[in-house]
Amino acid sequence: MDLLGKKVLVAGCGKSGLGAAGLLQKAGAVPVLFDENEKLDGKALCAREDYPKDTALVLGSLPKELLSELSLAVLSPGISIEEAFVSTLEEADIPVWGEIELAWNYEKGKVLAITGTNGKTTTTTLVGEILKRYQDNTFVVGNIGTPYTQEVLKTDKDSVTVAEISSFQLETAVHFHPTVSAILNITPDHLNRHHTMENYAAVKESITKNQTKDDFCVLNHEDSWLKAFAPKCPAQVIWFSSKEKLERGYYLVGSKICRNLGNGEEVLLDVDEMQLIGVHNFENVMAAIAIAAAYGVPMETILDTVKHFQAVEHRIEYVATKNGVVYYNDSKGTNPDAAIQAIRAMKWPTVLIGGGYDKQNTYDEWIEAFDGKVKLLVLIGQTREKIAECAKKHGMENIVLADSFEEAMDICVRAACPGDAVLLSPACASWGMFPNYEVRGKMFKEYVNSLKG
């Protein structure tokens, strides 16, 4: 869509919204920032360095006269398409996009796009590192931290963009067309937004909707949702599996990552050569290898990068050993399935901090995965009573409810003995206690690093 000189509403005044407005302004459109929160400090917002100069700001409700002037509306990922003002826009026949669709409108190169409930950040970061070693004009964007809108005007016909894409971002993607897509897994999450697993799965699968048989889609062979989806996938499917030797795809045999693409089995590397730990990370690595290889990166470059790649911040991140106790930060474990992977990676009796914002998930499988490994469960946040009841139902008795994060940390330090681990892996979002999981993880690390020993 040609937006030169057109007025575009950008809903949401966070990092994504400001990035979208900045892109529109640079591209010659006229952005108008909008937020329903009429109590937002507009003066402070407009004073931010990343606030697009001279951009109009509307707080509260949408003026009717503005509606008639708009050519497009762009929603930030945190804004649901079910919001009342979105219906107002649609009734006025104003197209509604998200930031991913807006960026795609200006994309000149190829895109490798990664989604899934868990593993997105690690996989995207690893693919980004591989591609950066392969070619200079590589951009790593999306849900990972740098908005796609911030980088897209730097792309050209030879560039590649590696994008981490969330379900919230896919909801408002219309023409987005990655050359290689990947869906790492689909497990319960964000059901407070998507309502049903069927809806959630459909949104994740929509990353492929504009792909063709000339494109590739990397899928997890162990995921029942993805097995059911594969026959409908418009792209060429490349499987990976941590449990089964595949006739075609990437798979784990003992400690060896192998592939067979129709020309016989090839051993690629031993997981002991990697810095990452845990089966979930072996899956992430297989997906990353498959994505990069499908794009055309030589295997030697891929494997050398994999061997030197370290865990991303806040995802089963080793922090320190204090007085014989190891501390791990898994603040990015914001749902039960992600937190299960962290528990499985622990090799020690574990004091676990869990709980946070309630996304309407269930916690039975998470509690069952403790398998006697969790010696004490310290619970915080909105879900603490809900999780405590679930844990008691499964026969767990060593449970403490803390009133604050600091109190939870104090309890953990007192309870942990030499040879134990203290793990922050909440299985819940951070909202309510923290602005995001990064702040939660940083607070954990600051506390640990302040300990003597």
Task: Give the residues covered by each predicted segment.
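N-terminal leader/targeting and accessory segments in enzymes
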Residues: 1-98, 102
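Nucleotide phosphate-binding/pyrophosphate-handling subdomain across enzymes
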Residues: 2-7, 17-27, 271-374
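Residue-level signal for inorganic ion chemistry
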Residues: 12, 24, 73, 114, ...
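Residues in the short beta-alpha loop(s) of Rossmann-like NAD(P)-binding domains
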Residues: 14, 37, 144, 222-223, ...
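Phosphate-binding loop of NTP-binding sites
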Residues: 22-26, 64-68, 77-221, 225-234, ...
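Short internal beta-strands
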Residues: 32-37, 217-221, 353-354, 373-382
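Beta-strand->loop->alpha-helix junctions that form or flank phosphate-binding loops
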Residues: 35, 60-61, 97-101, 141, ...
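C-terminal helical cap/extension that packs against the catalytic core
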Residues: 43-55, 364-420
